[in-house]
Amino acid sequence: MPRKALIAKQQRKQKYRTREYNRCQRCGRARAYYRKFGLCRICLRELAHEGKIPGVKKASW
């Protein structure tokens, strides 16, 4: 769980565009972020197992 200061820092407008980075909308994690869902890998996995993300299911072959 990121500190509140890090989340506030990320939300501020950056002077340079390259300094901007994505955070998980659910937990605030900055690493392993999936743009398509706006979530980190951990939250994506949890929600997918609960069936809360339409069209996502566990692979089986």
Swiss-Prot record:
GO molecular function annotation: rRNA binding; structural constituent of ribosome; zinc ion binding
SUPFAM superfamilies: Glucocorticoid receptor-like (DNA-binding domain)
PROSITE patterns linked to this entry: RIBOSOMAL_S14
InterPro entries: Ribosomal_uS14, Ribosomal_uS14_bact, Ribosomal_uS14_CS, Ribosomal_uS14_sf
Assigned GO CC terms: cytoplasm; small ribosomal subunit
UniProt keywords, alphabetically: Metal-binding, Ribonucleoprotein, Ribosomal protein, RNA-binding, rRNA-binding, Zinc
Cofactor: Zn(2+)
Binding site for Zn(2+): 24, 27, 40, 43
GO terms, biological process: translation
Domain of life, per lineage: Bacteria
Co-factor binding comment: Binds 1 zinc ion per subunit.
Purpose of the protein: Binds 16S rRNA, required for the assembly of 30S particles and may also be responsible for determining the conformation of the 16S rRNA at the A site.
Assembly mode: Part of the 30S ribosomal subunit. Contacts proteins S3 and S10.
Family to which this protein belongs: Belongs to the universal ribosomal protein uS14 family. Zinc-binding uS14 subfamily.
Name the record gives this protein: Small ribosomal subunit protein uS14
UniProt organism field: Rubrobacter xylanophilus (strain DSM 9941 / JCM 11954 / NBRC 16129 / PRD-1)
Gene: rpsZ
